[in-house]
């Protein structure tokens, strides 16, 4: 399994603000939970999709860097198309029903200076809206685009999402983190292979 896809690599901690166990997702990660764990991440131009089956109270979050790309490049979870498939398929494996899944989507801020023509944040936001529409998954809440990075907490058991818009002082930090991840992933060796199951 590609290291960027491993859900057991997600950092878990006790969140003092909400007094609950939390799991902090970094770019390329996703996680599905069926308990009171808060899923949290910090977003600049990246997007996080929070999906939930309200009947089973199961939900998950992903964090992707770019809308689409070459899934065979060694780090496919950086791309929204693959990250969305991973999240949806994991939820379905755990018993979620596709027709009940609903979405809340966040991020896509244009925090990278100098990218005024077709910025990454805008492309990510457009992608997630189009993808979910094509999959017939309703978006019941969103906070996309703009210029501010965000920190979000998603509570899959209740469907609640808390969004904290970060001040401009955090823009450089979030943009630097996202740029560093993009640079690291662009140098990732091409890996992969085919496993045949009979």
Swiss-Prot record:
It is an enzyme of class 3 (hydrolase). Pfam families: CheD. One of its GO terms (molecular function) is protein-glutamine glutaminase activity. The keyword Metal-binding does not apply. GO terms for biological process: chemotaxis. NCBIfam families: PRK13487.1. Probably deamidates glutamine residues to glutamate on methyl-accepting chemotaxis receptors (MCPs), playing an important role in chemotaxis. This is Probable chemoreceptor glutamine deamidase CheD. It comes from Stenotrophomonas maltophilia (strain K279a). The lineage of its organism: Bacteria, Pseudomonadati, Pseudomonadota, Gammaproteobacteria, Lysobacterales.
């Amino acid at each position: 399994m590609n290291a960027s896809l491993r859900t057991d690599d997600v950092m878990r901690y006790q969140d003092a603000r909400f007094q609950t166990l939390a799991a902090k997702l970094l770019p390329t990660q996703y996680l599905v939970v069926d308990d009171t764990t808060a899923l949290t991440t910090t977003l600049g131009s990246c997007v996080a999709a929070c999906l939930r089956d309200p009947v089973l109270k199961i939900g998950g979050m992903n964090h992707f860097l770019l809308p689409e790309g070459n899934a065979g490049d060694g780090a496919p979870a950086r791309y929204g198309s693959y990250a969305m498939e991973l999240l949806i398929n994991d939820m379905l494996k755990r018993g979620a029903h596709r027709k009940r899944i609903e979405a809340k989507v966040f991020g896509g801020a244009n925090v990278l200076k100098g990218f005024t023509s077709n910025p990454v944040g805008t492309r990510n936001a457009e992608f997630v809206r189009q993808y979910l529409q094509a999959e017939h998954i309703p978006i019941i809440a969103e906070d996309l685009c703009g210029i501010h990075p965000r920190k979000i907490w998603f509570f899959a058991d209740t469907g609640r999402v808390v969004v904290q818009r970060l001040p401009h002082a955090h823009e450089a930090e979030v943009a630097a983190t996202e740029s560093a991840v993009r640079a690291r992933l662009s140098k990732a060796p091409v890996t992969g292979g085919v496993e045949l199951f009979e």
